[in-house]
């Protein structure tokens, strides 16, 4: 969008801020300045009051005007037909410049003309296509003017145009009022006009899906200053109500559509297919959005209006359509009708309800009386969490304690943000906010990316984390990998060695056989084993990695060739941890050939056979939950060439007492390699159990100390 530097400066109260500083500010807060252009097309023009008009008898086209200026009365001739007595004009007097051409007195058809009157074409040097023919032929005539004032200053004819590239998600910033707020936030000034303050407004709910305002206004006119502002934005002047639509658009970013309606009875916006005669053209509408009254199309939103429902310049009551339409539907309308307008182009972007409110507040200053229709004025601001620790982590240093960061928060407060201890309230017009990262980006752009300290990154050599290859190890132990489904039928999910509390039933599933996440991989593996046995492949040594209930990763391996102790050795050789096997009372496992696997008193798996009441099988299983502990490889230790020693210890315990307590204490002693029971006998109502301990020399001392401490035999 093209912005006027002088108009932005006035809105944002930037009295002492130069053009160069404004350009720098735009670039620093994230708006790319694509192009700038200085406007200095005229010099030294003056206001004058028309005292007398008469025809030049020597010419068919020239009219002689006697005009009172601040210093004296001058005679200026013109071909324009709209000059009236007691009206005011602007004129180039001798010594003025038009496009660097010096204006001097000149003899025209026998009468000296002391300058020339100013029209739209002369004023800014814009292309003629922006000005209607009727305006192009005439000069500018004013009802009031102060001869002591300077029209160049009043109309800001010496200005800079700033063409800004604005990101698609910032449709709110395609407006003077929001962009002025951005500058005010950067420079720490305050805008006089509070965009969010909406008071003493009449609000109505009407049986129609149209949103907007009813307007009552004594006059419908556009000031000359505003017309030039539209020309600066490269918007064509057409008629009063179209120019007002564009003026509201460039100030608020809200597309609007004026309609000659005094009520919304039987008026709605609908999708329709039809052939429509409008604006001397035939338009074919193909399921596009239209505004209809009593099922007759009266307008295409933000694009065209039937003549009967257009606003007349003298009209005092009308309706302003302000619906927020689907950008997809708007683009479809443009594609179908191959027509465009500044309003509908803006409607292709995301428009927020906050932008609606900004437009209503701005229109309060334009019209005497407005009535809100079907628009909610009490918008709840979006809340976003505000975590100082998180912001510091993203910044890479303690940014929240910096004065520049505190100033950045104050800048956001000027934009309408409200800060609390743990949250931020985002102004309603900022639809681009979705989470904490958006808040951080906003704070950082006002903190200034140039203010971030330049830190040398700490360079470290790459750490290669080797993944332990269970597959290779299991394959070396004569196991074959299989693949099973994580989903099973509900009736096949009766085996639960881990005692999960709930079942995960899928909302969408390929079939009833694949509906629930299994509690164990055992029955899936068993199903494949039985299939292979039926095919006369009777030697089973399988393993699989998969997911079970609660999303846990598990490893399972099973064999009908190996014994319990052989599979136990396979388990302990896979991991570098001291797992503990405990006798299980789980009804799903074989009571005499199964155990639970614990690590640091935490259940991490099971080993053994399935309870015959569930399934008769000679397979011995091991199933481990891989996420319950950190998997690491065995660490290298220098080899000790000394032969291992063994010690035998006999424990005398009660008949109903378990030997496990003593075995646990023995296994805590470092460099003990093996503890096994070698003998049992009863004597004097006591159970005597002899264990053999295989250990290194340096463990003997620790073992002796433990024997004395615990009074073992």
Curated annotation (Swiss-Prot):
What Gene3D superfamilies does the entry give?
3.30.56.10, Bira Bifunctional Protein, Domain 2 (3.30.930.10), Nucleic acid-binding proteins (2.40.50.140), Phenylalanyl-trna Synthetase, Chain B, domain 3 (3.50.40.10)
Q: Top enzyme class of this protein?
A: ligase
Where is this protein chiefly located? cytoplasm
Identify the residues that the record assigns to the B5 domain, covering every copy.
379-454
Q: Which GO terms describe its cellular component?
A: phenylalanine-tRNA ligase complex
Domain of life from the UniProt record: Bacteria
Task: Give the matching CDD domains.
Answer: tRNA_bind_bactPheRS (cd02796)
Q: Which SMART domains match?
A: B3_4, B5
Where's it found, cell-wise?
Answer: Cytoplasm
Q: Name the Gene Ontology molecular function terms of this record.
A: ATP binding; magnesium ion binding; phenylalanine-tRNA ligase activity; tRNA binding
Q: What cofactor is this protein dependent on?
A: Mg(2+)
tRNA-binding domain mapped to chain residues: 39-153
Question: Where is Mg(2+) annotated to bind?
Answer: 432, 438, 441-442
Q: What does the record give as the reaction this protein catalyses?
A: tRNA(Phe) + L-phenylalanine + ATP = L-phenylalanyl-tRNA(Phe) + AMP + diphosphate + H(+)
Example GO BP = phenylalanyl-tRNA aminoacylation
Q: Does the keyword Glycoprotein apply?
A: no
Enzyme Commission number, as recorded? 6.1.1.20
Cofactor remark: Binds 2 magnesium ions per tetramer.
Keyword RNA-binding in record: yes
Q: Which UniProt keywords apply?
A: Aminoacyl-tRNA synthetase, ATP-binding, Cytoplasm, Ligase, Magnesium, Metal-binding, Nucleotide-binding, Protein biosynthesis, RNA-binding, tRNA-binding
* Signal peptide limits: none
Q: Which family does it belong to?
A: Belongs to the phenylalanyl-tRNA synthetase beta subunit family. Type 1 subfamily.
Q: Quaternary form?
A: Tetramer of two alpha and two beta subunits.
In Swiss-Prot or TrEMBL terms, this protein is called Phenylalanine--tRNA ligase beta subunit
UniProt organism field: Mycoplasma mobile (strain ATCC 43663 / 163K / NCTC 11711)
Taxonomic classification = Bacteria, Bacillati, Mycoplasmatota, Mycoplasmoidales, Metamycoplasmataceae
What gene name is given for the protein in this entry?
Answer: pheT
